[in-house]
Amino acid sequence: MTTTDSGTGKLVRTQGVTAPLGFRAAGIAAGIKASGKPDLALVFNEGPEYAAAGVFTRNKVKAAPVLWSQQVLTSRRLRAVILNSGGANACTGPEGFQDTHRTAEELARALSNWGTETGAGEIAVCSTGLIGDRLPMDKLIPAVTEIVHEMGGGLSGGTDAAHAIMTTDTVPKEAAFHHRDKWNVGGMAKGAGMLAPSLATMLVVLTTDAAVTAEQLDTALRKATRLTFDRLDVDGSCSTNDTVLLLANGASEVTPSQEELEAAVFAVCDDLAAQLMADAEGVTKRVRVTVTGAANEDEAVTAARAIARDSLVKTALFGSDPNWGRVLAAVGIAPITLDPDRISVSFNGNPVCVNGVGAPGARQVDLSGADIDVLVELNVGDGEAMIRTTDLSHGYVEENSAYSS
């Protein structure tokens, strides 16, 4: 699927942060990665407005670039975002924060020399990769000037940037929504491991040419994040570097309603979250766990997350085993209201458990396909929620045992 039409616009997966008007981007190899692959990305807002919003990891151990970006976003204004892969710059002490500050200052200087007067306080910095090592500033600083001159105004610059933020990702992740009223939202994401509730181990940059305020962006982003990235839970691990940013420049001169803005931002975030799930480390099954009939939405999220994180459930799904007993066992230890005799479970629309007991033919349900929908009906209220997750495969174990963090 590369294009999806709706009544209000079109969602496209072959475009990203440069799909909206007035944004440039680039991705280059700075030499941070030993492989020589692209590892530095830049997203630049040409204006005329520079409204911005962001959400960050809830991990108490925050990387230097997270602390920096949280600080600069208090102004609710950003001209640029610079992102590196190949090093998280987390748990690196005061020196790591100084490296982040220096990166922003060097980019501000390069942009100003390029012809756009920019201050370091208008630049967000994001990093991803191994925790505990400082970045090779002798390679990074010269590359900051180089990437400014590599910025393109076309779609290819956005794709280059999406490639440059990849770590264990196997494919770049982009999405754009083109509203029928001639305004747009674009985005790129990275993340393949440590996918968990506080946004997943992800860097996400979203852009829009809508004429909206930073307050409107903040509301739209928080609503979208709560229903998409916050409900992506592959392995229960929460990163030190999670960052989602949304920039707006008003270049379209169109002011959508708040509802229209929220719908478009959600559409892009939801598609990016689906792409993150599909490219999770070692994934062989894309799984959606939906809980209905919970006492309230919060309890539905708790129940769905308990199932999504359960190793026995995940290994059963890896083996295409319709083991509904493991689902009941997982939900049974969740701190929620439930009646065991009212729980029903379905796999891909096939009932396997009704009112707490097995349904006829439950063991014969075919789960050999790549997509599995798990529906759990608690029947104690009207709360519902969906969590995206994956199976637990040999590939996941092998990849994470070989990848230092």
UniProtKB/Swiss-Prot annotation:
Pathway this chain belongs to: Amino-acid biosynthesis; L-arginine biosynthesis; L-ornithine and N-acetyl-L-glutamate from L-glutamate and N(2)-acetyl-L-ornithine (cyclic): step 1/1; Amino-acid biosynthesis; L-arginine biosynthesis; N(2)-acetyl-L-ornithine from L-glutamate: step 1/4
Pfam family, one: ArgJ
GO biological process per UniProt: L-arginine biosynthetic process; ornithine biosynthetic process
EC number(s) on file: 2.3.1.35, 2.3.1.1
Active-site residues, Swiss-Prot/TrEMBL: T201
Superkingdom field: Bacteria
Binding-site positions, substrate: T167, K190, T201, E281, N400, S405
GO cellular component terms, semicolon-separated: cytoplasm
Record site: Cleavage: A200, T201
Localization of this protein: Cytoplasm
SUPFAM superfamilies the UniProt entry points to: DmpA/ArgJ-like (SSF56266)
Record flagged with keyword GTP-binding: no
Principal subcellular localisation of the protein: cytoplasm
Site (Involved in the stabilization of negative charge on the oxyanion by the formation of the oxyanion hole): T128, G129
InterPro entries xrefs: Arg_biosynth_ArgJ, ArgJ-like_dom_sf, ArgJ_beta_C
Keywords, sorted A to Z: Acyltransferase, Amino-acid biosynthesis, Arginine biosynthesis, Autocatalytic cleavage, Cytoplasm, Multifunctional enzyme, Transferase
Annotated family: Belongs to the ArgJ family.
Name of protein: Arginine biosynthesis bifunctional protein ArgJ
